[in-house]
Amino acid sequence: MAGPQQQPPYLHLAELTATQFLEIWKHFDADGNGYIEGKELENFFQELEKARKGSGMVSKSDNLGEKMKEFMQKYDKNSDGKIEMAELAQILPTEENFLLCFRQHVGSSTEFMEAWRKYDTDRSGYIEANELKGFLSDLLKKANRPYDEPKLQEYTQTILRMFDLNGDGKLGLSEMSRLLPVQENFLLKFQGMKLTSEEFNAIFTFYDKDGSGYIDENELDALLKDLYEKNKKEMNIQQLTSYRKSVMSLAEAEKLYRKDLEIVLCSEPPL
């Protein structure tokens, strides 16, 4: 049980700073899996109800179960019974609303990969703090949101604290992709079938018949189908087209190089 010193941040239904938003998220996502679910969701909802009553808001129903059902219908956009960070941003609007700014700019996986390509300039498989800062600066300009240097620094540090799961000061592609809504996050589809460097090199070499160091769109098509079949997973034509388009966003002149595909398919980004 939480003691008096461990009470959750008060859920004011007013504007929040990025730091306050993070405090609320970290408190309720106790297991750090990127969702609020189960008991976490129940605790979150109870605190939300307290905050609403504290601010004088009146609910239509006194039944907690009915309120939760109504709440989930409104905010659980992909109907998975969980609340993800981007969904929570709608419930608790932040002063800066940097998450929604981000999603507005990279609302699809294809746009996300194009943005990733632009800012992962050294092809390391990571966006580092200085690259992330430029990324966020561009997003804020695109959304016509005024900001100063200290505020931009706060956004950068907040995003790092949210998504830098191993604390190395960098954001990997899979970490950064958590900013996308689940239905747009094609990278999640490759979870559970990530390849070791040896496995990846073998499959890439198989499809790179001429040893050019890159594959084209048709070869990627075949590679993805092969990968799914080997892992006994189903994928329809629409999904295949979507995944291929997203991955090809990393290509140069329709050429997808080994290092770019390795970022997506390997369990660890290339060294």
Curated annotation (Swiss-Prot):
Listed GO CC annotations: cytosol; dendriole; dendrite; nucleus; parallel fiber to Purkinje cell synapse; synapse; terminal bouton
Alphabetical list of Gene3D superfamilies matching this protein: EF-hand
Pfam families in the cross-refs: EF-hand_1, EF-hand_7
Phosphotyrosine modification, residue list: Y214
CDD domains xref list: EFh_HEF_CR
GO MF term set: calcium ion binding; calcium ion binding involved in regulation of presynaptic cytosolic calcium ion concentration
Residues annotated to bind Ca(2+) 2: D76, N78, D80, K82, E87
GO terms under biological process: intracellular calcium ion homeostasis; regulation of synaptic plasticity; synaptic signaling
Subcellular localization, as worded in the UniProt entry: Synapse; Cell projection, Dendrite
Record-listed Ca(2+) 3 binding positions: D120, D122, S124, Y126, E131
Family, per entry: Belongs to the calbindin family.
PANTHER family from the UniProt entry: CALBINDIN (PTHR19972), CALRETININ (PTHR19972:SF4)
Protein name per its UniProtKB record: Calretinin
